[in-house]
Each structure stands twice: as structure tokens, then as C-alpha cells.
Curated annotation (Swiss-Prot):
It is found in: Nucleus. Residues 37-61, 89-112 bind DNA. One of its GO terms (molecular function) is DNA-binding transcription factor activity. This is Transcription factor MYB92. The gene is MYB92. CDD domains: SANT.
Length: 334
């Protein structure tokens, strides 16, 4: 016949024991012993169950409990008994005087079991483990993968630096090509038919760009370097076009040293550098240093003002030099 069921313990205290409860339990056991743990709580005046009183006495309050570290002999005894009995901690504790089953169980889980695993033994059978060799191939593959990953991590900074240097080189080449292609693209966008409507400053800038493409022409523009300043104060003259002869614009009584033209006079570029249309009433001021090394022009600082009516006549005497006021110079100008 089995043990009778435990009565209702809804009103019993649970949780940690207090020093007062420990003292009551020790005094009762020392005087009367522990004949029945189920009846002991009421006899000792404790609001606890019998099992709680038994565990408290056996694991903590018993006077013959041995404290401290386990000796090597105790460790070997636990290993031998566990290989035969298994996890029967109470039976093992009976073979070790002064040690409780709870203490032996904790010592096994925290020390002895890990020690057997490190030595290559199965903690349940105490025999060498054979499952290690079954997973050896997986361990080898994992090791090779980790080694490759480490090598990749070590090589990544070098590859990244190489990639950055390569990108910088490509960007430098791209900027160089853009710089080399910029003058030709700008000169191709210039329309010679729009010179009459563009300002004088834009015309000069366009002439700078287009002058580099006319080096093959046999035009001798050396006279501009020496005599351009003599005509920077002249009033507005007609723009030279394809239907006009140079003799109708330039004076005929000047020396040939002043104006040198090539045999191919039709190759003269139509560019109003210092010639302007007298019908224009908008003054255009140019304060640029024109440097054309290909045609012998070193430094020309001109301030050209084109106006109409009496304003140009009033300022002519103040702006023109005396040797240019001679009537013989303008006798052939229509």
C-alpha cells in the first residue's frame, strides 16, 4: 500500500529559511530526533512541510556536514560510484561521510563532468567518445573555411587601397581629356555669322579660340603688333566684309611697312577686333590683354569707344594724337 497523500499545504510557508526557524528545527532534532518528518513541523512549531524540514536538516543543519573542497580520494570515489550507479546522488552521498547529495551533485555538474569531456570520455558511460571522429571531416572543412575567411579579411584592405588608387588615376585621366577637348569644343560652337550681334568682348574671345585653327593660312598679321596702338583712338569705321577691298578702308598714302598683306588676301579672317559699325550706338569697352604669340602680338591694351553724332566729334580732338589729325590721312576715306 502506498503512502497517503499529503494534506492540503496551502497555508504553509515557502521560501528561504530564517535563523529562528533553523534554531527551532535544530533544538527539536537534538532533543527528540527525526522519527517522522511529516509530523515534525507541528511538533517543532514550524509552519513548514515535512519535506522542507528534512532537506534543510540534511543539507545544511546537520552537525556532521563536511565543508570545503573535495579531496582527490573523494573525487575518485564519486567517479567510480557514478560509473556504476549513475545519477543516484543519495546513494553516493551515503558512501561519503559528511557530504550531502546536493553538494555531490553540484560538484559533479560543475567540475567532474567537464573534466571527463576534456579528457575525451563520455560522462554517462565513462568510455572514450567515438562521435568525435565521425565529425572530423566537418571540423576540417570548417577550419579551411575559417582560414580562407581570415585570409580574405587580411587581403581586403590591400584590394580596397588598390581600387581607390585605380579610381583616382582614372579620374585624373578623365579630367585631362576634358581639359584637352575643351578648346576645340568651344571653338566649334562659334558661329561667324553672329559677329554683328555679339558684343565686342565676345568677338575678341571668339577670335582667340579660332586663331589657333588658322595657322595654315598665309596671312601676315605682324603689322598689328606695331600699328594697332596708332589706330586705337580712331573713330568708328566700317566693318571689313567680303565685298569691300582693303584700299577702301585703310589709307592709301601710308607706307607698305605699315600694312603687310599676303598674296592670298581672301584668307583674311573677318573679325571686328578694332573695327566697329558706325550705326551702333551702344558703347563697348574692352580692357583685355590680348596675347597672340603666333601672330606677333605681345601686349595690346585698348579702350575702344564707338558712339554716334556729336559725341564722337567732341571727344576726337582730346583723344587723338596730333600727328593723326592731318587731313591727308583721311582724304581717301569715303
Amino acid at each position: 500500500m502506498g503512502r497517503s497523500p499529503i494534506s492540503d499545504d496551502s497555508g504553509l510557508k515557502k521560501g528561504p529559511w530564517t535563523p529562528d526557524e533553523d534554531e527551532k528545527l535544530v533544538n527539536y532534532v537534538q532533543k527528540h530526533g527525526h522519527s517522522s518528518w511529516r509530523a515534525l513541523p507541528k511538533l517543532a512549531g514550524l509552519n513548514r512541510c515535512g519535506k522542507s524540514c528534512r532537506l534543510r536538516w540534511t543539507n545544511y543543519l546537520r552537525p556532521d556536514i563536511k565543508r570545503g573542497r573535495f579531496s582527490p580520494d573523494e573525487e575518485q570515489t564519486i567517479l567510480n560510484l557514478h560509473s556504476v550507479l549513475g545519477n543516484k546522488w543519495s546513494t553516493i552521498a551515503n558512501q561519503l561521510p559528511g557530504r550531502t547529495d546536493n553538494e555531490i551533485k553540484n560538484f559533479w555538474n560543475t567540475h567532474l563532468k567537464k573534466k571527463l569531456i576534456q579528457m575525451g570520455f563520455d560522462p554517462m558511460t565513462h568510455r572514450p567518445r567515438t562521435d568525435i571522429f565521425s565529425g572530423l571531416s566537418q571540423l576540417m572543412s570548417l577550419s579551411s573555411n575559417l582560414r580562407g575567411f581570415v585570409d580574405l579579411q587580411q587581403q581586403f584592405p590591400i584590394d580596397q587601397e588598390h581600387t581607390i588608387l585605380k579610381l583616382q588615376t582614372e579620374m585624373a585621366k578623365l579630367q585631362l581629356f576634358q581639359y584637352l577637348l575643351q578648346p576645340s569644343s568651344m571653338s566649334n560652337n562659334v558661329n561667324p555669322n553672329d559677329f554683328d550681334t555679339l558684343s565686342l568682348l565676345n568677338s575678341i574671345a571668339s577670335f582667340k579660340e579660332t586663331s589657333n585653327n588658322t595657322t595654315s593660312n598665309n596671312l601676315d598679321l605682324g603689322f598689328l603688333g606695331s600699328y594697332l596702338q596708332d589706330f586705337h583712338s580712331l573713330p568708328s569705321l566700317k566693318t571689313l566684309n567680303s565685298n569691300m577691298e582693303p584700299s577702301s578702308v585703310f589709307p592709301q598714302n601710308l607706307d607698305d611697312n605699315h600694312f603687310k598683306f599676303s598674296t592670298q588676301r581672301e584668307n583674311l579672317p573677318v573679325s571686328p577686333i578694332w573695327l566697329s559699325d558706325p550705326s551702333s550706338t551702344t558703347p563697348a569697352h574692352v580692357n583685355d590683354d590680348l596675347i597672340f604669340n603666333q601672330y606677333g602680338i605681345e601686349d595690346v591694351n585698348s579702350n575702344i569707344t564707338s558712339s554716334s553724332g556729336q559725341e564722337s566729334g567732341a571727344s576726337a580732338s582730346a583723344a587723338w594724337p596730333d600727328h593723326l589729325l592731318d587731313d591727308s590721312i583721311f582724304s581717301d576715306i569715303p
